[in-house]
Amino acid sequence: MVRVSRGCQSCVDAKLQSTPSPSPSKSPSPTESPEQCLQKRQSGEQVVLPSRPFPRTSPRAEYRPVPLLALDGYINPSLTVTAVNSQQAQVFTNYVLASFPCFFRCTETRVPVNWVEYVDQRGSSMNSCFDWAVRACTSAYLGSLHDDQRYLVASRSLYHRALRGLGNLLSSEKTAKSDEVLASAIVLAIFEKHNCSSPDAWLRHAAGIRTLMKLRGPKAHLEGFGRAMYIVYRNFLITAALVEGEACFLEEPEWQALNEEIAASDAKLPTSSLYTDVVERGFLSVIKIPGLVKRTRELQCLSSKKRAEVQPALLQDVQATRAGLRGIYTEFGVAVSMLRSGQDENDTFVGPVPNFFFEGYSSLFARGVRLGLLILNYLIVIMDPKQRATIDSENFMLLNDMTRSQRSTHPALEFKLPLTPPKSPGRPGLVVRSLITEETREPPTTDWMDRITSTMGLEAVHVSLVG
């Protein structure tokens, strides 16, 4: 019990619950009513309130809950933060290995800081735009993994919170150039591909990331975590360029130079091989495809006279790119065979990369090269119909190879020969359809993102030639 000082009428009226006092003075009689206690108080006599509340029949009684503090947070406020952060890093690692298994394991040694290391190194940073974006992805992953709608609802809330935080950071050019802003934008873009909140939302994300990369400049993506961000998202930029009908800005000389510097840097690594060099050169060829598609479409809109002037140079560029990609395909097969040579079937590792991931990544990259050759063949048919018979035969072999190695979970999207009959009237035209839609999207527990990135973005589009 605590002693109530003179003049504290409101305390008496409220009849607050009190805590025991180490030196109580005078206890009231159990038979005394509240009115009798009040009369003693007014006469100047000390009144000691009981340590328990008055009976519930009193209309003036008031009870207030006392908030409880978590013991860990009370003793050391950082304990809870550290525990949550540790769990978050582990869940993010599981998410990356589920969504990007082959691509991550085959590229993690090519970057100074990979994505898992970056998340782990951030320590107890939990109230930032990037961390909200990461938690949005991991919550969606857990919701899909355990079929729990609570996680999915929470992930959307975190997604919108991260978007607002990203908007605040973009208000300053200095912060807009930071690694955290680009990393947040990339994580949110990946989240959007899995959720498809609107048909073109992922394209808006891609446009924003393209702007951020240009603002930062190529050199910002050569070292540190910048390289990891660039390597993982550059493939989606090819997808976006094809869907939008535009050339990919990575084809520009300064960005081509960046890719060449990355390839040269990779060649100096202890884990480097002909395999990684061929992969980089294959990417350099594929980034030209969106620009060639755009130029071919523009060619079809020209008059016959103007078309006759422009077409030879364009056809030569397409054929040169196709020849280069064919060479890459052959070299890649040789490089893979060299790495496999001397390996027993039961061996766990092929070089520094586990056999499972190596085989998966090799298969997907080869598929991406075939898809690139298929698109280039379509462009040649549009400009030079005389090559139709030869190209039909080659396309049949390419599609047959891809059907045998088909990994897509969408049977309805199996590849067919989408060529117009050779004698059909009218000009054939190229149709590019996005496969990042509400109907074709896959959850983050699948390797859908892995298939897109490892095929250099070409797995996310369906290209056909129609008349």
Swiss-Prot record:
Matches recorded under InterPro entries: Fun_TF (IPR021858), Osmoadaptation_assoc (IPR053178)
Disulfide-bonded cysteines: none
Keyword set, alphabetical order: Stress response
Pfam families reported for this sequence: Fungal_trans_2 (PF11951)
Inducing stimuli: Up-regulated when grown with elevated levels of potassium chloride.
Region annotation Disordered: where it falls in the sequence: 1-60
Residues forming coiled coils: none
Presence of keyword Flavoprotein: no
Known function: Involved in osmoadaptation.
Identification of the protein by name: Uncharacterized protein AN5342
